[in-house]
């Protein structure tokens, strides 16, 4: 046999046969290999393009027309690979992990396959979409974890493959290595980084042992023994397994937000361990987990509500096992309950618990995001405008109630989950419910970005406040919302009266009555243009509602429900300059 796929072969060694000539075959690898004689001889394909080539489509009508998918996106050729067009108007980012800070708007940063780490605001305060040019490169190599200092939004900790961790000062632009150098340690391709929820100067970093820095990576201490199985059959000198991929490493670490030093760790060879005293003593929990596959531990999530509660997920796709594995413990790992329930067949990459509602859980798997409102008894797909794709990481922004999903192939998606926080089985039995609206900042629009029109634009959040509501049954009429500034009604909105969960958007505006002279001038102007116009458009104008507090009344089926909401002043725009 002849090895032609390169070494290491990696996971994308696809074979593609030219539909117009069976003797022409391509093998995808770090570089694409090609044969023109049915495999007798092989050479590197004459593609002056690509690198880590994952996918190849060959036009059945024209073999010179091909589309190549690789680590930096995609390329299109019409001349057999001599020249390539690289379209940048598609969202094709392969994220491994995502983090956020507490600035306004908050920043999102994530690591990309062979494309470094990048950071941008979650919305464009200048108005319009999030431009390609508004992303900043904040790390190199294969980008992995990105975790912010949540106290002052100054420091970003990130890494490239196999653990080279750096600290970026977002105020000064200084970037420096803070890697703990010990050649005997093994780091995963995507080695976990954790900023302690109790002290933002304290950082944890996973190798085969857990590392702790008491002060921003200036120094490190080892706070565990080897937490993996360390099977000699999987280990080589400084590496694990075949090729250049290290094995027997920590893949996930979390600290209880309720108890300092209560740490959970999972490894790629199936170990799950916990310490209650910052690493002095560790307990191996494998035997307590029912039907434990001892596969790659994709996530351990410490509960925000109970220090003895945690969640656990495994991924078995490397073992050709595509069952979902999700567990929950309420007694520090002594017993575990399977909560995979009706999740589809497919590996689970991440699980998150909401910080306000302990029964509100989210899972990211190979198909997208799934939500449970009953603590994992049942799961529902969150599709909406999100295509089917693997979700490798998720975070929940505690102030904004946004779910941030990092996909491995279609970029980052953000969903407003504020309404879901209140959803319970009891609420769904009600006739109607008006969810608590979240206040919104009216951004100062300044510093517009120059951009290329052919680049991809991300979506900003609407410059509006959503009003979410639920109806247990059809009303046969619209639902109305009236916004009051004090005692004065300033805006009226209508929404669907059908059963289900709905949303209407208030554009943070107020209806202002024009003077008689202004109304007459408008009538004359529309008459000159020969246009018919509604009398309300003549009588009222729409103006931005001022910064301040408002009352919203929802009327549904003759019943009224009242909520408060605020428009916040943009006090942070100078920080963004």
Question: What are these language model-derived features?
Answer:
Residues 559-576:
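Short beta-strand elements
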Residues 166-168, 465-488, 549-553:
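Beta-strand-rich binding/interaction modules
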Residues 1-455, 462-466, 470, 474:
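Beta-propeller blade termini and top-face loops
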Residues 293, 489-543:
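Glycine-centered tight-turn motifs at strand-turn-strand junctions
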Residues 174-177, 378-380, 487-493, 561:
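Surface-exposed loop/edge segments in extracytoplasmic proteins
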Residues 305, 460, 474, 497-499, ...:
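Surface-exposed coil/turn segments at beta-strand junctions on protein surfaces, enriched
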Residues 92, 388, 498-499, 546-547:
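Surface-exposed loops/turns
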Residues 512-515, 555-563:
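Short acidic/polar inter-strand loop motif in beta-rich domains
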